[in-house]
Amino acid sequence: SLKGQGAPNVGQQVRDLWYAQRDADDGCTLAAGEMVAQKKMTEDEVWRRARQSAEANRQKAVRDAVAIVAPEAVGQVAELFASPAKYLAGQSKSRGKERKELALLAIIRMASSAPEAAAGQIEGGWGAQLSSDELNWAWAVVGKQTAFKLQPEANSYFSKVRRDADLNDDLLGWKVRAALRAGDWKAVRKSIEAMGPERNESTWAYWRAKSMLAGRPSAEDRAEARQLFEDTAGTGSFYEQLALEEIGQRVTVPPAPAPLSAQEKATARSNPGLTRALYAINAGLRSEGVREWNYATNLHQAGGLGDRELLAAADLACQQQVWD
């Protein structure tokens, strides 16, 4: 149960589910509020949810998060979304940490459309008022938006981040991309090593190994890079295949899967999540149906459906002439 005392790590479970949601959800918001009240989640974690939602342009999700930690400031969310520049130039009604976090939300919103202007706000005075954590996040968001536009200044903005541990994996991923474009292998390695579990994904494992071989690698770096390539090598993804080539093996076409059995097809047809998804799509609710399909195949059970189950689901979709 997520209510009451619950499991020892219930706060982390709620936080992770909440962070994974792009849109606001009343149930998760209520659970997050309870976790904060029980001191199983921190206010900093709630503000981080607000930052992520501001970047995704989800005003209600930002408002819901702010309502947990600063209910008297909820009205300011609409103001900073409507005109970040005007909000930053005005006299804030809040003080202390609340004031700085709201200013950071405004900088994040500004960066989404005008990263150079957001950088100007940071350098023009707000940077001196933000905490080190807030400042690092602000520069990272500016760097991300600049990198997204393939502008050469991106790595320079990211270099202003003084502590990678203050960033989430999404921002660190963009920091890596900017560093790769700039040929900054030291930053590539440092940023990937600061990631959470995502660092073990084939993409980042491959680039981490490559960063270890840049410049003048030590024997230890060479050995560790080789081990990473060996652990990553395979045929399941692009970077797995690149890692395969790095250890001197050829990429070959995997054998065709065995035909689906009648039982496998029947299991797919009886899957309630897939059934709901196809029903919604056939009823004209395509976006809802696709969302239900993605949940049924990827999220309903830990690790998602297996390869054979996915193949059966794809076969079912083809029979219904659903191609996406």
Question: What label would you give each PLM region?
Answer:
Residues 1-324:
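Cell-wall glycan-active module
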